[in-house]
């Protein structure tokens, strides 16, 4: 008799995706982040669901309802901080996942890669709208500044911004619709993640060597299920350390001040995971130019596969490209730091140089170095 997991229509899908899936025998811990992102997403949906049961999306009561969750709801404080810091863990995993893709040439699966870019945009949109919901000072002013960027679009910009706001400023209508979008988007992300997996399973996973591994596959279960569980334990450990010891470490103290349209905070800045893009936005003195650079800072990932000039897939055997990759990582860390600094000398210049370097590495230096490496192979 055939095993039910191989015959039942629903169980068969799960079986072919997580149990009998043929996987390369040499994938490292860098391949753990897909499953960790799945765990992050489910954790965010669950904690978010329980928060939504007590939250009110009204300007008069939003701030108080979050305080009420932390003070009066059973274990409300831990749910709230798990949700807030869960977002940070989500983005840490996202950045490492994308970095892995860049390093090992996983972008050579164009469908999987492009769905991944759409997923990144969707998660960023979700996080931005979630940050507005507590209706603190940084929530309000962050929403005002970021939505205002759309006014840089020629001709329709101003009308578009007022349409998104539902009025002439960020107000009650804006908060209500942001809550609605923040609730629905994670489910869209979930569906996109399923499509992401679907495309990945069409080709199979890449591996650190970048060499096809069809001749050397092992079943996903038990080898990679146990490895994923270990990764999940580390993720939960890191999250709970953050939640229980320093829950406000990554947040902004200004968000504990209720939103006040009459009082602008001295430094308006987004959450840490958007700072690199915010620094790129601020480094261009022109509004439309800044907005385009901001969008392109993520969209540039879509061009990476087209600029792959190397004869090898990954960077495992390409020391020059490796140096360039780690320079890119250092540059992104620099941009993140600059994004949190005030707009004054020397930060302006550092930000501009780091922004130029970011695009130069991805669009010019990487393809050029790859061609040099190809020629070095002939010697």
UniProtKB/Swiss-Prot annotation:
UniProt record, GO biological process: mitochondrial electron transport, ubiquinol to cytochrome c
Residues reported to bind a ubiquinone: 201
Residues where heme b b562 binds: 83, 182
Disulfide bond residue pairs: none
Family statement: Belongs to the cytochrome b family.
Its job: Component of the ubiquinol-cytochrome c reductase complex (complex III or cytochrome b-c1 complex) that is part of the mitochondrial respiratory chain. The b-c1 complex mediates electron transfer from ubiquinol to cytochrome c. Contributes to the generation of a proton gradient across the mitochondrial membrane that is then used for ATP synthesis.
Protein name (Swiss-Prot/TrEMBL): Cytochrome b
């Amino acid at each position: 008799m055939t095993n039910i997991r191989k015959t039942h229509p629903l169980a068969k899908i799960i079986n072919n995706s997580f149990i009998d899936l043929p996987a390369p025998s040499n994938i490292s811990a860098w391949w753990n982040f897909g499953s960790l992102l799945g765990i992050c997403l489910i954790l965010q949906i669950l904690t978010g669901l329980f928060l939504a049961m007590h939250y009110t999306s009204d300007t008069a009561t939003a701030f108080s309802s979050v305080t009420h969750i932390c003070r009066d709801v059973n274990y409300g404080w831990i749910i709230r901080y798990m949700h807030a810091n869960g977002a940070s863990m989500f983005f840490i995993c996202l950045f490492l996942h994308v970095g892995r893709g860049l390093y090992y040439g996983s972008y050579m699966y164009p469908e999987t890669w492009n769905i991944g870019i759409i997923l990144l945009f969707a998660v960023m949109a979700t996080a931005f709208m979630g940050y507005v919901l507590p209706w603190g000072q940084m929530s309000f002013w962050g929403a005002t500044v970021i939505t205002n960027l759309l006014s840089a679009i020629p001709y329709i910009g101003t009308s578009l911004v007022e349409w998104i706001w539902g009025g002439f400023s960020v107000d009650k209508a804006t908060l209500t619709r942001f809550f609605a979008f923040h609730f629905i988007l994670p489910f869209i992300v979930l569906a996109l993640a399923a499509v992401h997996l679907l495309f990945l399973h069409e080709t199979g996973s890449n591996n650190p060597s970048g060499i096809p591994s069809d001749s050397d596959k092992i079943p996903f279960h038990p080898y990679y299920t146990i490895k994923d569980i270990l990764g999940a334990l580390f993720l939960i450990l890191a999250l709970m350390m953050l939640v229980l010891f320093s829950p406000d470490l990554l947040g902004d103290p200004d968000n504990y001040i209720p939103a006040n349209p009459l009082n602008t905070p001295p430094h308006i800045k987004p959450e840490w995971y958007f700072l690199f893009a915010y620094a790129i936005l601020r480094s261009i003195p022109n509004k439309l130019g800044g907005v385009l650079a901001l969008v392109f800072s993520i969209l540039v990932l879509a061009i990476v596969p087209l600029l792959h000039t190397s004869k090898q897939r990954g960077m495992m055997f390409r020391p020059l490209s490796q140096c360039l990759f780690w320079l890119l990582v250092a540059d992104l860390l620099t941009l993140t730091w600059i994004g949190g600094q005030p707009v004054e000398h020397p930060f302006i210049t550092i930000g501009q140089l780091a922004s130029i370097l970011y695009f130069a590495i991805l669009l010019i230096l990487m393809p050029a170095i790859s061609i040099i490496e190809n020629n070095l192979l002939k010697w």
